[in-house]
A protein has these predicted regions:
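Active-site-proximal loop/helix of nucleotide/amide-processing enzymes and allied scaffolds
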Residues: 1-28, 36, 45-48, 70, ...
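Glycine-enriched loop-and-adjacent helix/strand subsegments that border the catalytic/binding cleft
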Residues: 29-72
């Protein structure tokens, strides 16, 4: 967790953006997790940073990362815990965290495949299309949809070129 000396706050200093090595988050079960505060613009870095938050899960977990203007992680929300082969999510649930997290200028969604194979299903592709369309309407860039598997394997809709190709006019990424 980032510590700001109390006397700094009393002097009226304003803090705009922090650059620190790690950010401490709590997962959906209350466990403390430390994640690097690297920019998550690159799918490889995003996968390496976020995959450990979903590692060793026996069921599909769907989460959203709220990102700053520099694509640094501001907040992490687990939105759904499903079964070994699926999870359900509603579109509004994905965008509510952006409203609750000051400074959010982009989103990155991620879910795991407990089978270990990050290959997207047809349902994953349809969901990504719907998310990208909604993000475009809300003028809130969807940076990527990552699917993480085992052994550091992942699938990035952005890297595959399908995130921007799915919508006429593209999604700003």
């Amino acid at each position: 967790m980032l510590h700001i000396p109390h006397d700094s706050l009393q002097r009226g200093h304003r803090v705009r953006e922090f650059v620190c090595t790690y950010r401490t988050l709590r997962d959906d079960q209350g466990q403390t997790v430390r994640v690097p505060t690297l920019a998550l613009s690159d799918p490889r870095i995003a996968a390496a940073t976020l995959a450990p938050l979903l590692a060793n899960e026996a069921v599909e977990i769907f989460a959203v990362a709220c990102l700053s203007t520099k694509h640094r992680l501001l907040a992490w929300y687990v939105l759904s815990r499903g079964t070994r082969s699926s999870t359900s999510i509603s579109l509004p649930d994905v965008f509510v965290p952006a409203c609750l997290t000051p400074g959010t200028t982009a989103l990155l969604v991620v879910h795991n495949h407990p089978s270990g194979d990050p290959t997207p299903s047809p349902e994953d592709a349809r969901l990504t299309l719907r998310l990208a369309q909604a993000a475009d309407v809300l003028d809130l860039p969807l940076l990527d949809h990552l699917i993480v598997g085992d052994g550091g394997r992942y699938f990035s809709f952005r890297e595959a070129g399908t995130l921007t190709a799915q919508i006429a006019g593209g999604v700003r990424v």
